[in-house]
Curated annotation (Swiss-Prot):
Organism listed in the record: Streptococcus mutans serotype c (strain ATCC 700610 / UA159)
The keyword Magnesium appears for this protein: yes
Positions that bind NAD(+): 273-285
Site positions (Important for catalysis): 138, 183
Top-level EC class as recorded in UniProt: oxidoreductase
Localization in the cell: Cytoplasm
Keywords assigned by UniProt, alphabetized: Amino-acid biosynthesis, Branched-chain amino acid biosynthesis, Cytoplasm, Leucine biosynthesis, Magnesium, Manganese, Metal-binding, NAD, Oxidoreductase
Name of the featured protein: 3-isopropylmalate dehydrogenase
This protein's GO CC annotations: cytosol
Length: 344
């Protein structure tokens, strides 16, 4: 039996978590997948329960889980507080050594009109951004004085090698192309990044490697996003480019993500926030959460059939014109969830 720890969090988190688990249970019955759920407080809910966004019992449960589902964190009441929900996310990434953030970017045909790009620009877009999550300038030394400031960007060969291998492994199961993004013409870290990328490429002779400078890649992501298959880059560049890629579908409501460690549990979550303005109204779009469940089935448990079942059901539901308000429709959370289950 697989143990899944759920972190419903704040805002619309509990509502979309319930939707995700409802779909998960329906699929689990169809594929005979045996599991148990352990729900834990996290984010603002963790602060309310224990004074910390990542309570000790939540962390202990997460460390022994086979996978972790996170819905959403954040609440206006903590915006100016010394202890904030977002600190829990940074803490759990560090404690579980979640070094690889995986963000799929796919355009659903039924939602093409929502994209800010012309139809011909987004046709065929289906790529994955692989972002190194625990190294680089965010985790370097930061110095600030009255007249100067300094941030240290540091990467080791081993840190680069493991994220590269993750990207190449993902590409091997897709269209076998990796685009490594750096700033090799200026930065020493990028020179090492490119060197290690070339070394790892030799281990995956069936996968094509290309390099792009980050400024060029940012431009191509708008002018020709369909050219990408797997994009891999360091923490700062990945933070920016993954957010850029998230606007291509025209909505955050259909985008899941995963964060992987080397040997421990992975964490799956929507990329959108807690949307406190609509919390409790029953109108939140659950698709990002539901697709995060699909990612969990595929990546953590090897249940490709179950993952595809969910993805096909979501696509069919959207094609039928069943849309939540953020997508231009009238369906509420429960109606969208029920429609997806009916289409499994």
């Amino acid at each position: 039996m697989k143990k899944i720890v759920t972190l419903a969090g704040d805002g619309i988190g509990p509502e979309i978590m319930a939707a995700g688990l409802e779909v998960f249970d329906a699929v689990a019955q169809k594929i005979n997948f045996d599991y148990e759920i352990e729900a834990k407080a996290f984010g603002g809910a963790g602060i309310d329960a224990s004074g910390h966004p990542l309570p000790d019992d939540t962390l202990a449960a997460a460390k022994t889980a086979d996978a972790i589902l996170l819905a959403a964190i954040g609440s206006p009441q903590y915006d100016k507080a010394p202890v904030r929900p977002e600190q829990g996310l940074l803490a759990i990434r560090k404690e579980l050594n979640l070094f690889a953030n995986i963000r799929p970017v796919r355009i659903f045909d039924a939602l093409r009109h929502l994209s800010p790009l012309k139809a011909e620009r987004i046709a065929g877009v289906d790529f994955v951004v692989v972002r190194e999550l625990t190294g680089g300038i965010y985790f370097g030394q930061h110095t600030l004085t009255e007249n100067s400031a300094c941030d240290i960007n540091e990467y080791s060969a081993s840190e680069i090698r493991r994220i590269m291998r993750k990207a190449f492994a993902i590409a091997r199961g897709r269209s076998k192309k990796v685009t490594s993004i750096d700033k090799q013409n200026v930065l020493a870290t990028s020179k090492l990044w490119r060197q290690i990328a070339e070394e790892v490429a030799k281990e995956y002779s069936d996968v094509t490697l290309e390099h792009q400078l980050v400024d060029s890649a940012a431009m191509v992501m708008i002018t020709n996003p369909a050219c990408f298959d797997v994009v891999v880059t360091e923490n700062l560049f990945g933070d920016i480019l993954s957010d850029e890629s998230s606007v291509l579908p025209g909505t955050l409501g259909v985008m899941p993500s995963a964060s992987h460690s080397e040997s421990g549990p992975s964490l799956y979550e929507p990329i959108h926030g807690s949307a406190p303005d609509i919390a409790g109204k029953g109108i939140a779009n659950p698709i990002s959460m539901i697709l995060s469940v699909a990612m969990m089935l595929r990546d953590s448990f090897g249940e490709t059939a179950g993952a595809e079942m969910i993805e096909h059901a979501v696509n069919k539901t959207l094609t039928q014109g069943i849309l939540t308000r953020d997508l231009g429709g009238l369906a509420n959370t429960k109606q969208m969830t029920a429609a997806i289950i009916a289409n499994l």
